[in-house]
Regions:
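Contiguous, well-ordered alpha-helical segments that form the cores/surfaces of helical PPI scaffolds
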Residues: 112-116, 132-140
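Amphipathic, small/basic residue-rich leader segments at the start of a protein or domain
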Residues: 1-125
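Phosphate/diphosphate-binding loops
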Residues: 135-136, 141-155
């Protein structure tokens, strides 16, 4: 058992009982989502966070990155690379990218719940996986050149 256990019932309470997110699901831009789908996403992500992402927390904390000043290169522990790969291979990066770039349209509150699990299990992975978030900002607020760069960032 790793250091992190996601409290999915607490997240469910906050999303649906406290914030009433169910009222916006099934409508407008969230027409393809319902409570069961959102909870399925959260449950699947819980498994990823508690296992694949949390697995590299200790290595990332104790060993960290190594910077070689002579070459300008940075080396990550292999376990961090493996955790990051699991996150990207599961296509969870899509939750932070705009729909126009292949992102998943979900309520911000659901994105925050997923981010909470990443941050709790391994904050370093959250930082390494912020590229799509930056692409989102560049795509939504940037010039035509910025939008082109944003597309490259998620490819």
């Amino acid at each position: 058992m790793g250091h992190y256990i996601a409290n999915l019932r607490d997240i469910e309470f906050c999303l649906f009982d406290l914030l009433g997110r169910e009222s916006i699901l099934g409508k407008s831009i969230y027409k393809d989502l319902d409570r069961e789908t959102v909870m399925g996403m959260l449950d699947e992500f819980k498994r990823l966070a508690e296992n694949d992402l949390a697995a590299s927390f200790v290595d990332g904390d104790r060993d960290g990155t190594k910077f070689d000043k002579a070459t300008g290169s940075v080396t990550l522990p292999d376990s961090i690379k493996k955790s990051y790969k699991a996150y990207m291979d599961g296509e969870w990066w899509r939750i932070d990218a705009p729909a126009a770039l292949g992102g998943q349209v979900i309520p911000m509150t659901v994105r925050w719940a997923l981010a909470e699990m990443v941050l709790g299990s391994n904050p370093a992975i959250h930082l390494y996986a912020t590229g799509p978030s930056f692409a989102h900002v560049a795509y939504m607020l940037g010039t035509d050149r910025d939008k082109h760069i944003a597309k490259l960032m998620v490819d």
